[in-house]
Amino acid sequence: MSEATPAGGAYPRVDMSNGGSTAFPALEENVLKYWEKDGTFNESVASREGNEEYVFYDGPPFANGLPHYGHLLTGYVKDIVPRYQTMQGKKVARVFGWDCHGLPAELEAEKQLGIKDRAGIEEMGMRSFNEYCATSVLRYTDEWKEYVTRQARWVDFDNGYKTMDPGFMESVMWAFKTLYDKGLIYQGFRVLPYSWAEHTPLSNQETRLDDSYKMRQDPTITVTFPITGATEGTASVKTLAEHPELADAAFIGWTTTPWTTPANLALAVNPEVTYAAVRIGDDAAGADGAEGMYGKTVVLADDLRGAYAKELGEKAEVLGTFTGAELEGMTYEPLFGYFAERAGEKASAGEGSEGGEGNQRKPGAFRVLCADYVTTADGTGVVHQAPAFGEDDMFTCEAAGIDLEIPVDMDGKFTSLAPEYQGQLVFDANKAIIKDLKAAGRVLRHQTIEHSYPHSWRSGEPLIYMALPSWFVAVTKFRDRMVELNHEQIEWMPSHIRDGQFGKWLEGARDWNISRNRYWGAPIPVWVSDSEEYPRMDVYGSLEELERDFGRKPASLHRPDIDELTRPNPDDPTGKSTMRRVPEVLDCWFESGSMPFAQKHYPFENKEWFDTHSPADFIVEYSGQTRGWFYTMHVLSTALFDRPAFKKVVAHGIVLGDDGLKMSKSKGNYPNVNEVFDRDGSDAMRWFLMSSPILRGGNLIVTEQGIREGVRQAMLPMWNAYSFLRLYASQPAQYDTSSTNVLDRYILAKLRDTVQGVSDALDNTDIATACDEIRWFCDALTNWYVRRSRDRFWAGDAVHPEAFNTLYTVLETLCRAAAPLLPMTTEVIWRGLTGERSVHLADFPKSENLPADAELVTAMDAVRAVSSATSSLRKAHKLRNRLPLPKLTVALPNASALEDFTKIIADEVNVKQVELTEDVAQVGGFEVVVNARVAGPRLGKDVQRVIKAVKSGNYTVDDAGVVTADGIELQDGEFTRKLVAAEPEHTAEVSGQDGLVVLDTQTTPELEAEGWAADRVRGLQEARKAADLQISDRIHLTLSVPAEKEEWARTHADSIAKEVLATDVKVVVGEQLSHDVADDCSADIVVASVAS
């Protein structure tokens, strides 16, 4: 038996298990206690004082709810990058912040207080409500701190900021005033997404946030608008005169929002589209009462007649066609009489006249307008215009001089302007409106559709679009500059977001509605005169300016204190009017976007620092923030400073439950975070999340098995290597890279490559690749280096100090390289090895301090790949590893580079002979086979071209295995690689080496005997352990075997004796002895000499 007695005792230099459990969760708890007591985090920042700073923005969460997996994922990234940059010598402040204002805070407070609507807030009182909000938003700060701390995330809570802090709010005031002075803020009346449930408009980007669009069933109707005449001076006068068939015709228009029809004031057609006047056949089928439509003439886009074939009937007759431009100015009968007085007055020239030149009116409502946005993609090509409820409608009607009417109040209910529906929520009124329109014979079609519809991102109620007065940032004025800065100065991961998800959003950016009709938020710092006779508006950007004009500072910048600041209007000579603050507060996204400068109370403090440390070096959040925080920061930084807010951004994907769906507490489709921490530890969770595709923009399914992979891939290999060193080291090893042993040289050179790879990856914030580098190295360390070096370690550090020094050097360096990725596991190992204060106070290793040997690394990696491929063949043929085989043929393009390693290969895969050849083609190869069924839908007719190219050999396969045939790159699943070899069942591909191995599996009695003996050695070693022998105890061995195996046993008795430390071996036949060795063998073991 070659293994010696473990010496041990040299390690750990510091025992972070405190003599207790060495399970990872228990060790992590000890690390966290140590860091808190030691002040390690503060020291890591203070020790870099005066060095170059690395600026990182930590997006502020709300503390009125508990953290979830999304926060966990982002938090790990926010910890890894600063840890790495700190170890690279930079000072990295990690200030934690809290979002406090806005709808999320108000709605949670309402929920806690049992308030159901705005009236409840008014009854409670604005001051009391806001005071409650101020407390509520920090309700879960302790839980957040515990959560963040448990995940080993280092942040500065003590010096953190809150968006409700006076300093932060004053900086926000400054931003508003600065934008206003630049002409980039204005008050306008626009159609906006409006939440009737929350009584406030929202911004366009808020309607693009997660969960904002939901599937919803709504009624759709196609209604008639009977033509009544023409508007004087328009093309329709001539059209009506030349086409008498239009005299009794009606336009038909389609809408998915029947509740908007009481506010209809116009119709829109496309001037370039051809429209048809169609007489409905008597075989038509339509909505209830549609039989009353038989023989009537309707006007719709000619291309859409087929979409209404059922309602028009097979006997329908086209009476004439016209362009939209020829229809412009035609007047029609309103659907409802609510605003009938808005129709144009009859023109004097048309009074009493006949035909097309009669029935003329002056321009007014209820006429046809031309608009380029009208299409024939759906509907009828005639669009009903309700300018109070549609942005395009509003612009079109404004241009035509048609003022809007708003028959809906701030509760989303009809007002007295639509008396039949007064008090009804607009969505609830749909049913009654459709019923009334049917009774009037105006409905041609009535259906129900399921469509994606915007909902409030907080309350979940469906939004309406409604014309409202609001304050806007004029984003369209500097949109091109935003696009330019994004393209030229921001690095995205994944890179496609720059010109894709984010870039396209910027290109279509609209003016940003920043006012909210709410209570708890930063005030819009605008005061206006309450007199229309003496108008005046003042905008303020600081507390000092407020004190200058109002003679005092407000008790706080929140409502109602800020609202109480009033003063006489300086422009009113009568002294009767007063300057009062406008009631709105700012969109909380405006505050989040102000975070880079507002957290520093810029420009009132830290001006020089911010001016020289902006943009930030790095930020991270999930990809949906391209519509949220990423966007608002970019808007404000571009407008205020003409520079981006950040240089580099990671936009990660979404964490999904184990069923591939959104995480849900009710479904229980994800493992409890605290249970994972208790069972596997935070480092395991960190590794699972950080090594996944989610950081490259993909989504990730969280499973318990996946999390445990983190333990298997990196934590256990590192720990096992450290434990191996602890077990056998009798004295502390040294940092030494001078060993000439080939395995030592390999692992040190491999470590050099790994350190460089991790550094390159983390420099690029490519954390998943950094994890790959560590994982690959851990495999080489434990599954190759330590295993192949066991004999040297068993011999002890007095005999092979170079092995112990090398392993110490590797572990010490690996701990520093992996510290940002596995902060607690590496802390335990590193302190155990070195006895020093913390691995996180050390410098990141430099690859140039390790020996380079590219040829050796390449050759040994090939040896490992050959061994792995051979092992897979053994498994396929169910040939146990201890059974020697006659021959292995290794066919590689650079096989000659392995000549010095054939003994290692032979020993590793247990073959008697290793033959090398560089003629791979003679052994076999791979054919590419195109999967036409999969590739066909994507490639279309090109699939045949690809198949032909592959069959003729006109294709390439790159290092990543990507196949390109005749210039067309094939995707995963569109092809397979088929092994073609003389002995395919004995041949395997050598991964990553463009080669093959061929294993001769023919055995001989001699080989069988040798394998049989090796199996018995294994059984005897287990028997020694069962007998509680020391590793170095020598024994007298009696081995009982079947008669047919007696010759094998006697032939290999000496080799068996050597392996199990037997001074002598007695072979007997057919006896049952005290220790079972195998199915057919037993043994008696008597100690010959006891180890001292």
Curated annotation (Swiss-Prot):
Belongs to the class-I aminoacyl-tRNA synthetase family. IleS type 2 subfamily. ATP binds at K665. This is Isoleucine--tRNA ligase. Signal peptide: none annotated. PANTHER family: ISOLEUCINE--TRNA LIGASE, CYTOPLASMIC (PTHR42780:SF1), SOLEUCYL-TRNA SYNTHETASE (PTHR42780). It comes from the Bacteria. It is found in: Cytoplasm. Residues 554-574 have a biased composition (Basic and acidic residues). The gene is ileS.
